[in-house]
Amino acid sequence: MKRELKVLIGLACLFVIGLPVFAQPNSRSIETFVLDDFDSAGSQNYMYNGKTYNWDWEVGSSRFIADGYPKTGYFEGVPNSLKQLHKGEDKEFKVFGVKSAFKRKGDNWFEVYPTSDGKSFEIPFVGVVSQMDFWIWGAGYNYYLEVMVRDALGTVKVLPAGSLAFHGWKNIVINIPGWIKQSSHLRSGPENLTFVGFRIRTDAEEYVDNFVVYFDQIKYTSNSLSLIYDGYELNEVDFGDSSDSDEVSGGDAK
């Protein structure tokens, strides 16, 4: 009798302990978003907060860039791994390319960044981002790639993405560190982490003429529901004072 009682008590304990595990709701929604596949220039149709965004790509460089550089363009091409994913589709694949040359060796760099209406445009990420990945074509030069993002405090963070001293296509995956602040409680501050652009630096001893790089399919993985809460839509209600917001002193208000 005692043995049966012990068995019943043990089963009851297991049920009580396991109950919260099964009853606990899961607020995580892990999704993958494509920022740009470069197949339709200026027609990304990227969705964020119910709005559609499109952009172009520009390149800025350091002072010793050679005359007539950098050069950019969209070209036919696709990594073999991506081609297999679209096997059988009647689709024209494009990549975005940059060709650079500098007048001398040293700490040279150029940045590839999105623009809209002729101005730099930072692409907002949906939710809390855990990682980014993209395809890049290396020419074997000892150059270094960096990814630039802006956190919810308005500070640009530079994430190293490794060397470009390889030939052909390579899938680069970078994790977004947990110490980067991706949301802010300030209603007047940035809503989310944003993508600023890529920066490519030359090694001080590497050749700086005739360098070429290509980009394809930039995407990211995110917990898309992490910043959504009950009543989220009320956050953007207009009280009729939006036109007067510039009259409030930022120093006095914050």
Please state what every model-predicted region is.
Residues M1-I9:
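Bacterial N-terminal signal peptides that target proteins for export
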Residues I9-G18:
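Bacterial N-terminal signal peptides
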Residues A23-K254:
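Beta-rich carbohydrate-recognition modules and glycan-binding surfaces
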